[in-house]
Amino acid sequence: MASTFRKSNVASTSYKRKVGPKPELTEDQKQEVREAFDLFDSDGSGTIDVKELKVAMRALGFEPRKEEMKKMISEVDKEATGKISFNDFLAVMTQKMAEKDTKEEILKAFRLFDDDETGKISFKNLKRVANELGESLTDEELQEMIDEADRDGDGEVNEEEFLKIMKKTNLY
């Protein structure tokens, strides 16, 4: 059953993950990251304290959870010095900004399916998109796709369920 969702082009036609080099930031984004870093590098040493990582990330509009913070710190502060260099901070923020962009892309795709703006993708929405894309899927196959993504059992796919299934299918 799960394979129906993965084989279909309905969700992937124009939203495939960009394959290639690591995500890169624009010059403006790099400047923004530099300014946030410099704000906390008060002694000009080129490093910030790991305790300030969360605050610096907040300055850039991110709200990392405690588990996320522990993981990031262990990845960038391998020698457990308690300090993070600008390059390490830039690497973390490049990844976080790419993840944010991915989520926004997925939500844009969700809104294309949810043309009646109910906050959910119904069977009718999915059938319309399949027809628009020229996909010849049976009603049964379309229903299987809904069932695969529908975690709360209401017969439709909400934003959270859509995000989960899209990440699970590795289309993003």
Swiss-Prot record:
Domain EF-hand, residue spans: 28-63, 64-99, 101-136, 137-172
BP terms from Gene Ontology: cell division; cellular response to heat
Residues annotated to bind Ca(2+) 2: D150, D152, D154, E156, E161
Keywords: Calcium, Cell cycle, Cell division, Cell projection, Cytoplasm, Cytoskeleton, Metal-binding, Mitosis, Repeat
PROSITE patterns: EF_HAND_1, EF_HAND_2
Subcellular localization: Cytoplasm, Cytoskeleton, Microtubule organizing center, Centrosome; Cell projection, Cilium
GO cellular component, one term: cilium
Keyword Nucleotide-binding on entry: no
Region annotation (Disordered) ranges: 1-30
Tissues expressing this chain: Expressed in testis. Localizes to the caudal portion of spermatozoa in seminiferous tubule and epididymis. Expressed in retina photoreceptor cells (at protein level).
UniProt: Ca(2+) 1 binding residues: D41, D43, S45, T47, E52
SMART domains named among the record's database cross-references: EFh
Family stated for the protein in its record: Belongs to the centrin family.
Complex and partners: Monomer. Interacts with CIMAP3. Interacts with USP49.
Miscellaneous field: Binds two moles of calcium per mole of protein.
PANTHER family (alphabetical): EF-HAND SUPERFAMILY PROTEIN, MYOSIN LIGHT CHAIN 1, 3
Protein name: Centrin-1
Taxonomic source organism: Mus musculus
Organism classification: Eukaryota, Metazoa, Chordata, Craniata, Vertebrata
Gene encoding the protein: Cetn1
